[in-house]
């Protein structure tokens, strides 16, 4: 089911978490934040909306590292009911797409609920103080649209890196609903 994300709640603090990567390595929010901020992306392996953006997402995340913005991806789906999203498949997906950031599994779905995530992909861009500054889409080329790419998330997070604030105007992300237990 297609869902749009809510608007950005500017200044909302990032909820703390500690989750395991697909290979059982543990990460906490405090370990992940970069000098200028953190991009938290709720994604999964099977959603066609994620598949359509994953290449640009990974490239943008890599470029943002040079600006002091780190990235973490979190898989929130019930992988028992949706085995394509299980931790083993997450590892394969991360390797296939050359993730340069942790891909964590939210077994209890509590982190997704704490953040207010509703779909995959769902992006949360935080400044260095872990205050929400971006809750929008990756770019204008959702689901393979043609045309010149406008990297909205990248541009927003570059603004966050330089000013600490996100853009006032943001366009909601859309994607597959999170598969709740």
Which residues make up each language-model segment?
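Chalcogenol-based redox active-site neighborhoods
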Residues: 1-170, 176-181
């Amino acid at each position: 089911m297609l869902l749009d994300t809510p608007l950005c709640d500017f200044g909302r603090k990032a909820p703390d978490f500690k989750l395991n990567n697909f290979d059982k390595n543990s990460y906490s929010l405090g370990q992940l934040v970069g000098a200028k901020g953190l991009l938290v992306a709720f994604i999964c392996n099977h959603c066609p909306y994620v598949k359509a953006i994953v290449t640009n997402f990974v490239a943008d995340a890599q470029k943002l590292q040079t600006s002091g913005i780190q990235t973490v991806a979190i898989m929130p789906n019930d992988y028992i009911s949706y085995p394509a999203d299980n931790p083993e498949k997450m590892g394969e997906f991360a390797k296939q797409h050359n993730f340069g950031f942790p891909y964590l599994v939210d077994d209890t779905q509590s982190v997704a609920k704490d953040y207010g995530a509703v779909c995959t992909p769902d992006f949360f861009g935080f400044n260095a103080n872990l205050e929400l500054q971006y809750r929008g889409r990756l770019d204008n080329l959702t689901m393979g649209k043609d045309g010149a790419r406008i990297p909205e998330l990248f541009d927003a997070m570059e603004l966050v890196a330089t000013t600490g604030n996100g853009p006032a105007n943001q366009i909601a992300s859309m994607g597959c609903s999170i598969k709740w237990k």
